[in-house]
């Protein structure tokens, strides 16, 4: 396995897909990196030379914020929203949808599991 930005890249996948295993690199950013590094996107990771892997690693380190740094930045942005007390920060603090979705129904992912259903119990016969 090639190791780029602290992530083990799967050997059997094409490099254009495998590079997206890095947090912060999607399909379009991955293609940009490969274009700058002069690497064919259709080649498998196992077929890359050490020099090509080094070029990819260097471009990502130089031009992109990935993995731990990016996660930390996102967390700090959310914390800043909560500290200043804006609407988005309050929604984050309460664990509710932030981007205007409805909450009367269909907010289960953000709000967590539903409470116990309250219904009518059958009477036990004696």
Swiss-Prot record:
- List every stretch annotated Disordered: 95-126
Q: Does the keyword Cell division apply?
A: no
Q: Name one GO cellular component term.
A: cytosol
PROSITE patterns cross-referenced by the UniProt entry: RIBOSOMAL_S13_1, RIBOSOMAL_S13_2
What keywords are assigned to this protein? Ribonucleoprotein, Ribosomal protein, RNA-binding, rRNA-binding, tRNA-binding
Does the UniProt entry include the keyword rRNA-binding?
yes
Q: Return any one Pfam family short name.
A: Ribosomal_S13
InterPro entries associated with the record: Rbsml_uS13_C, Ribosomal_uS13, Ribosomal_uS13-like_H2TH, Ribosomal_uS13_bac-type, Ribosomal_uS13_CS
What NCBIfam families does UniProt report for this protein, alphabetically?
A: uS13_bact
Family recorded in the similarity comment? Belongs to the universal ribosomal protein uS13 family.
State what this protein does: Located at the top of the head of the 30S subunit, it contacts several helices of the 16S rRNA. In the 70S ribosome it contacts the 23S rRNA (bridge B1a) and protein L5 of the 50S subunit (bridge B1b), connecting the 2 subunits; these bridges are implicated in subunit movement. Contacts the tRNAs in the A and P-sites.
- Entry protein name: Small ribosomal subunit protein uS13
Q: Which organism is the protein's source?
A: Chloroflexus aggregans (strain MD-66 / DSM 9485)
